[in-house]
């Protein structure tokens, strides 16, 4: 059948608008809590989570972020947790596809929110199925306490992250952690269970 050029143009225009909107939403999420908090991270001599991933990945290779819109549009009181406060992405490191899990230190100092555990667990599950090394970029102030009752409960609560750590280890999937500054409570368990841990001079771990 002949191509309906008018229909094609109409749908192409509508799709272009949606792609533009999607790009805007991705940019909003990438800014975390905004320029003020990005600047606060930089004033501490740190990089943001996405800047760390950019520095880690092989040059001129893509970063395939997953779970970008977890918690999108959801409010916790007057606060938001863009991407659930954690960046999960596939990227190539030393020529090998890798799953990177990085706390977003522009959102409540990298704390965990509702859906943060599920997002981390999903990334771990993908790494396990694909046998991809996991790199944890940890800069985590622990659980966002006002929402703790919604973060631990259920079959996919925070404790299951550590079960995934064990399953990855049992399957022989490498797990490497880099700790930058805060590493408190649940955020501290992932480095402890990893095969290798690197810490900056100002980094510390507190297990609770």
Please report, for each region that a protein language model flagged, where it lies by residue:
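Terminal-region recognition feature
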Residues: 1-182, 186-189, 193-206
